[in-house]
């Protein structure tokens, strides 16, 4: 796989990225959305030792360097502590600068939810920032800021103290703007091995929307043409969602957007070929009770999509349809989990298979839907059994296999109830290297009654565990918003403990970065990857 677009430089010791605005350097909590550091660290085996040396505020964009080796970490830590690292930022303010060059030296102290610049006599940490006016354009002034020290919010605090708050910095008195106009534009460090200077520069982009910059940073448009473009309130558009599906856009919300808005999206490429058509579907709470035709998206503007059309994700081809009901054939928020199956790499220090299998690894995908997980596991070298209570979706899954040069005849597709077949397979003493559980939020059957993820997930795990080989991996996932991370994890762990087995490796995966998380748009997708010891 190619490097993520955010990577600016990589060598044996260093990884340098251009962080987009609105993305944390690291995750703010164990079950929150990943920061750019977490996302990179767990993405590639070669980045497993990635270390944070310095940080950028969530809303600040620009250059960020990570260490890849112990040698690099020691060298970079020394360089930052001895102030040998050159960092230059560019900021924009709408207040007039009276001087072309000036230096601010003060103590920066915490003051509630922000920081304050006080005289050095007040105590606290000494902070120094050099400022230089780059240009004046109308009411806006562009300045270069060079922090000599590295305190939290230092540039923002010092700019505000000089009467030049950063545009978009509401915390420190800046005028309202679409984003914080602060960018880490230049970085110079010493190469840990050679001692040579490494100097990198990335110009600021204060005009492209932050939502677009985030997707530009993580989506390789050559390998992937289907992803979430707008995630509601997390992207500043409460209650509104937009997906790119190859040549089509799918909008979702409470109310149908006006034709003028949909028409304006035609031709907008977002780094891809032009949009052919724009569809809309209302946000439905009870999809099961709505007829297929009524639940299916409807065209707002442009050209009607073919009944079936292909899209790309991480170089894998999937068939989608906008005429088969509420779901289009692929859950975009599971992209990173499909990549883990494709690459055979779960997270830092966590390979999918504990050791090279003596034969072909076996994977059981329950609630397989159109077999997206199955295709990626098969491309990763596994023999896959896909289990679902829909012949239509299993046939769809077979076509997905064929689209990727895989012969469906070399894999099993089982039609039937998952709960029933888990018992049958256990009686046959079948064992699998990987079990995939991604059940619907609610299901109902005559034999097994109602299943609700928020209360019954543990019982599903208990039913599946006898099929998992010792040191096999369980992928347990749910998009049930009402089931919070802690109770979900608790249910899964309790089932494993009750089965007399033990978790030896664990990774919690949130939704991917194109589904960003905010207070107004909380995380909903939860995934546990667990290597489990003990007999099946």
What spans do the regions from the language model cover?
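RNA pseudouridine synthases
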Residues: 1-128, 135-138, 179-181, 197, ...
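Pseudouridine synthase
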Residues: 32-36, 40, 70, 110, ...
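C-terminal catalytic and target-recognition region of SAM-dependent MTase-like enzymes
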Residues: 195, 473-536
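Non-catalytic substrate-recognition/targeting regions of SAM-dependent transferases
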Residues: 235-236, 242-243, 259-332, 339
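Conserved SAM-binding loop of SAM-dependent methyltransferases across substrates and taxa
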Residues: 370-382
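Conserved SAM-binding motif I beta-strand of class I
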Residues: 383-388
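S-adenosyl-L-methionine
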Residues: 390-436
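Mobile active-site "lid"/loop adjacent to the S-adenosyl-L-methionine
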Residues: 393, 415, 432-463
């Amino acid at each position: 796989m190619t490097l993520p677009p955010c990577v600016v430089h990589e060598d044996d010791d260093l990884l340098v990225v251009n962080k987009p605005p609105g993305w944390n350097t690291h995750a703010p909590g164990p079950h929150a959305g990943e920061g750019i550091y977490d996302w990179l660290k767990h993405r590639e085996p070669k980045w497993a030792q990635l270390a944070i040396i310095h940080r950028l505020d969530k809303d600040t964009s620009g250059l960020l360097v990570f260490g890849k080796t112990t040698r690099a970490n020691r060298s970079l830590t020394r360089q930052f502590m001895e102030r040998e690292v050159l960092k230059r930022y560019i900021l924009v303010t709408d207040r007039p600068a009276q001087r072309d060059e000036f230096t601010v030296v003060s103590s920066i102290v915490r003051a509630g939810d922000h920081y304050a610049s006080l005289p050095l006599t007040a105590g606290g940490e000494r902070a120094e920032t050099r400022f230089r006016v780059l240009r004046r354009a109308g009411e806006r002034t562009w300045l270069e800021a060079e922090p000599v020290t590295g305190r939290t919010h230092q540039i923002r605090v010092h700019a505000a103290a000089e009467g030049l708050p950063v545009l978009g910095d509401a915390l420190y008195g800046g005028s309202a703007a679409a984003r914080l106009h602060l960018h880490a534009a230049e970085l110079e460090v010493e190469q840990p091995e050679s001692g040579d200077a490494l100097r990198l520069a990335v110009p600021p982009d204060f005009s492209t929307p932050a939502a677009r910059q985030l997707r530009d940073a993580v989506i390789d448009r050559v390998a992937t043409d289907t992803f979430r473009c707008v995630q509601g309130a997390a992207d500043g558009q409460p209650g509104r969602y937009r997906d790119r599906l190859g040549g089509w856009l799918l909008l979702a919300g409470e109310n149908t957007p006006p034709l003028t808005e949909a028409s304006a999206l035609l031709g907008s490429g977002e780094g891809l070929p032009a949009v052919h058509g724009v569809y809309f579907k209302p946000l439905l709470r009870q999809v099961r009770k709505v007829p297929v035709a009524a639940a299916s998206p409807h065209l707002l503007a442009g050209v009607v999509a073919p009944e079936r059309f292909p899209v790309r994700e991480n170089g894998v081809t999937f068939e989608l349809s906008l005429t088969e009901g509420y779901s289009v054939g692929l859950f975009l928020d599971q992209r990173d989990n499909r990549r883990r199956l494709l690459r055979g790499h779960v997270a830092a220090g966590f390979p999918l298979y504990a050791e090279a299998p003596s034969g072909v690894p076996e994977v059981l995908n329950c609630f397989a839907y159109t077999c997206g997980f199955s295709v990626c596991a098969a491309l990763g070298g596994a023999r896959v059994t896909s289990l679902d209570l829909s012949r239509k979706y299993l046939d769809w899954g077979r076509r997905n296999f064929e689209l990727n040069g895989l012969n469906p005849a070399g894999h099993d597709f089982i039609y039937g109830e998952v709960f029933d077949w888990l018992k049958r397979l256990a009686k046959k003493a079948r064992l699998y290297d990987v079990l995939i559980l991604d059940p619907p939020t609610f299901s109902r059957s005559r034999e097994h009654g109602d299943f609700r993820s928020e209360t019954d997930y543990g019982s599903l795990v208990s039913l599946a565990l006898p099929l998992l080989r010792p040191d096999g991996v369980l992928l347990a996932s749910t998009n049930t918003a009402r089931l919070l991370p802690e109770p979900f994890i608790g249910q899964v762990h309790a089932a494993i403990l009750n089965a007399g087995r033990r978790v030896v490796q664990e990774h919690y995966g949130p939704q991917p970065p194109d589904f960003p998380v905010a207070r107004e748009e909380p995380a909903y997708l939860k995934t546990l990857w667990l290597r489990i010891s003990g007999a099946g």
